[in-house]
Amino acid sequence: MDVEIQDTPGKISISKRSILSGTVENIDYPHYCDLLRKMNMPFVKGLENRHNYGRFEKKCNPAFLKFHPYPPSVLPDYHLHDPYPPPYGPHYPLFPLRDDVTLGDSCSGFMSPGGDADLNPGIGRTIPTLVDFSDVKPQHRVPRPDTGFQTTIKRQKILSEELQQNRRWNSREVPDISIRARLGGWTSPLKVTPLQPHHEGRSLSHIFTFDEEATCTDEGEPLVQTNKKCNAKDSFYKSSTQKAYEDVPWDKMLPPKLVPEETTLEKTADPISQCFTLKRYKGVPAITQMVGELWDRFQTRSFLAPVKPINFVSSSSRSKYIPLYTGHVQSTNADDVDNPLGDIASLAKQRYSKPLYTNTSRAANIPGYTGKVHFTATHPANSNIPSTTPSPDSELHRVFQKEMAVDLFRHQAPLSRLVTTVRPYNPFNKKDKETIDY
């Protein structure tokens, strides 16, 4: 199968014609062109534009020495290179940048494949296992054979036998299990003779007789004194008691019996959570698992992730109006309402949820006051009335304001300081005028 690969730096493109022309040889690595287009796969660096591979080719680099344990023999005096790699043995270096091999698999809880390759149990480098010898790794576990058609026939036969039986409650019926247990041979092929029960001084076949005595006098009045024999006679199990038990609807009062399972072995054991859940295991692989090595090489993003740049921004955060405001927002361009980079200059007065200032410490401003207030005023009514008992803080602030007072005109020129005593007076003269009577 011919695959056309373009040499564009940073991208890989596979033609659809080569994919659909024939079957894929490797089933585990199918090429899903439509699925790969939906994924946000990072760019693959080619030979021209290397990505993090140049450091392996540097001389005297530990990663280079591990990748090439012995220098090529074509180099002159290759055995004199320093540092010389160690010889082959138990301390032979691993693959480049593979020193931190985890021994345990975080998914299954057993030994990871990297730990098996590092320890080499067959060569002699073994460690004591942390699990029982009966435990088997998931990749080495043999599935339980399914009996198939024979199990289906057996279940149908048992079901037909149960349907033919009378499932109503019968107190006189003796179960087959009880009869087989009495006769023996339930757990052994030989017939077991049950032992005779020993009774001390009494027998089950003993018949009790009661003398019929008169229960009433000759005049027809019942006897007052009770007889113990009558009480003992009434406590015996009689046919009337049996009939009373049969009239009780036990089938409606008692739950149905539980059918025992054929085996106690779990179908799919989970060594991590130790729970049994059939919905967790799916026989059909997901689409993301069928991508192959590209899925393991690059961690993809979720399909539901928002694609940047984001072209929508809430207009209420920029117009400074309350949320869900459906009124008119004035702007230079109407398209800037949905544009995150647009300029919205609202010319209308903004709405505030902050209430107006109220002061209930004064006599005239009691709650429910309906005095006259100007329609443009934001202060409460009669707020200019001074308080009856000024606090010391107000006197202190008043002194500070008097000391920090600054001239309103701030004229410091010589002509501004002149004082004219005739009309028109100097407007900057702030001396008090005195009237003299002749």
Swiss-Prot record:
GO terms for biological process: cell differentiation; spermatogenesis. Keywords: Differentiation, Spermatogenesis. InterPro entries: SPATA48. Pfam families: SPATA48. It comes from the Eukaryota. Essential for normal spermatogenesis. This is Protein SPMIP7. It comes from Homo sapiens.
